């Protein structure tokens, strides 16, 4: 039996089902390259010592260590922060496990998407899509965040922007993200990410973080730390407008 388990965005968000599985399985693996995973919480409930897997273990080697455990007739769990099938997809592992004849159970966790909207007072019913703000690769900037926000602003829909993770595991800061967005505006010049564009910054959610509603021109000078997400609001209703003011700067 193979489990893919989400334990939420930070300490205290783990579910009863996740705890039950961690206390039953013989092999526990985890990855923390997609989000900050609370290893202390994982160890508190784990029956055995958890083994960390890098991106290459899961992608380049197709989860070889996991399948070695399963081939011995043991139960195995892969643990992630947040919800295991939203911000990152381990669908390839599920497909491979089923092709090999193993049963698979996905255990949902509190996702960053739901948690960020809960923290921000904004309606998730108006979420128009998700994009990622990435560092430039080879001097090339991804325009996907710009294009999606532009479309959603025209439709009165909110946009959730996830922030990049560097190859060395460092999470993009809100300041760096704001700088990327302002650079995109300088290139595209369609008024999407002007310095006075106000966004919601949800920083270090689940780790004693904070929520801020401020213009990009101020965020680019801030000292807020990652991991974080941005929500670009549009078409605020009266309830959203009043509530979001409590996070204003």
Curated annotation (Swiss-Prot):
Residues annotated as binding S-adenosyl-L-methionine are 83, 86, 111-112, 163, 205
Role: S-adenosyl-L-methionine-dependent methyltransferase that catalyzes the trimethylation of the amino group of the modified target histidine residue in translation elongation factor 2 (EF-2), to form an intermediate called diphthine. The three successive methylation reactions represent the second step of diphthamide biosynthesis.
Protein name (Swiss-Prot/TrEMBL): Diphthine synthase
Q: In the Enzyme Commission scheme, what number(s) does this protein have? A: 2.1.1.98
InterPro entries found in the cross-reference section: 4pyrrol_Mease, 4pyrrol_Methylase_sf, 4pyrrole_Mease_sub1, 4pyrrole_Mease_sub2, Dphthn_synthase
Q: What class of enzyme is it?
A: transferase
The answer, when asked if S-adenosyl-L-methionine is one of the entry's keywords, is: yes
Pathway(s) where this gene product acts: Protein modification; peptidyl-diphthamide biosynthesis
Instruction: Tell me the lineage of the source organism.
Output: Archaea, Thermoproteota, Thermoprotei, Thermoproteales, Thermoproteaceae
């Amino acid at each position: 039996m193979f489990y893919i388990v989400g334990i939420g965005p930070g300490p205290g968000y783990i579910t009863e089902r996740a705890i039950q599985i961690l206390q039953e399985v013989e092999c526990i693996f985890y990855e923390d390259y997609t989000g900050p995973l609370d290893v202390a919480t994982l160890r508190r409930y784990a029956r055995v010592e958890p083994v960390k897997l890098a991106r290459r273990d899961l992608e380049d080697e197709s989860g070889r260590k996991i399948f070695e455990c399963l081939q011995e007739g043991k139960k195995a769990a892969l643990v992630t922060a947040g919800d295991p099938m939203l911000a990152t997809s381990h669908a390839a592992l599920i497909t491979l496990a089923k092709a090999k004849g193993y049963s698979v159970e996905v255990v949902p966790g509190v996702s960053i998407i739901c948690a960020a909207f809960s923290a921000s007072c904004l309606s998730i019913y108006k979420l128009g899509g998700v994009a990622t703000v990435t560092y430039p690769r080879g001097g090339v900037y991804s325009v996907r965040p710009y294009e999606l926000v532009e479309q959603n602003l025209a439709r009165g829909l909110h946009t959730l922007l996830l922030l990049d993770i560097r190859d060395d595991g460092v999470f993009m800061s809100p300041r760096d993200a704001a700088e990327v967005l302002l650079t995109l505006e300088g290139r595209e010049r369609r008024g999407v990410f002007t310095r006075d564009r106000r966004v919601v910054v949800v920083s270090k959610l689940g780790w004693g973080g904070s929520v801020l509603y401020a213009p990009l021109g101020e965020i680019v000078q801030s000292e807020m730390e990652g991991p974080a997400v941005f929500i670009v609001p549009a078409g605020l209703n009266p309830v959203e407008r009043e509530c979001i003011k409590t996070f204003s700067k």
